Amino acid sequence: MNTPQQLDNVETKFQLSLKTKVWQGVFGDTGDLWVGYTQDSHWQVYNSQNSRPFRETDYEPEAILMFNTHYELFGWDGRVLGIGVDHQSNGRSDPLSRSWNRVIADVGFERDGWTVMVRPWWRIPESRVNDNNPDISNYMGRGDMQIIHEWNGQELGLMLRSSLRGGSENHGAAQLTWSFPLVGNLRGYAEAFKGYGESLIDYNHNASYVGVGISLLDWY
């Protein structure tokens, strides 16, 4: 793309997340197979000069094998352990195509209204010819940690992501979220993001975002 896009700083973001259990008791009485799908769309709804385009849409299907666990570690209850396969792409052709495939481990802990999820991952290698973002792990990271606290129907979340590298390959992101009940299933939602990888097309750009909106359901 030779002509730079004339984009507004203010846009609308839609997120659709679905997750369901497709097989309970994969190994007799243990192990449940879940499949999920997440879609993020960034809409330049206020950009009337350029026909209000969708700036970016990212698609992320995944399959996860989860195990319930019961152990204690430093006063925290180990609740879940999982392993999954994840594909994320923006569905575009070169030179704007962005995608990667990962194997992701999930380890979850709970304690007194707090939940901590630790997710290290490994990127599945691609051939040099097909890889349109070979350095994506240095920006989107090699793992993240999510900390969630629930109280009085409200939920505060912190996501920390890191490349787990030093020097020029040291990049990451942080996101703070807050959701609270409004009416029925509607919840108010606010978020602040700083770092790399808020969307795939901008994976190697350091950016800051602040947003407010509504959500129908909360899950993580």
Per-range role (PLM):
Residues 23-33, 69-80, 95, 112-115, ...:
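Short loop/turn motifs that connect adjacent beta-strands in outer-membrane beta-barrel proteins
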Residues 1-89:
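Transmembrane beta-barrel domains of Gram-negative outer membranes and organellar outer membranes
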Residues 6-10, 27, 48-51, 91-99, ...:
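Solvent-exposed loop/turn segments connecting transmembrane beta-strands
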Residues 10-14, 31, 55-61, 79, ...:
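Residues that define the transmembrane beta-barrel architecture of outer-membrane proteins
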Residues 207-220:
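Outer-membrane beta-barrel "beta-signal"
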Residues 88-163:
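Detector for outer-membrane/organellar transmembrane beta-barrel domains
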Residues 1-3, 39-41, 81-91, 116-124, ...:
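Transmembrane beta-strand segments that form the barrel wall of outer-membrane beta-barrel proteins
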Residues 17, 62-64, 104-108, 144-148, ...:
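Outer-membrane beta-barrel architecture
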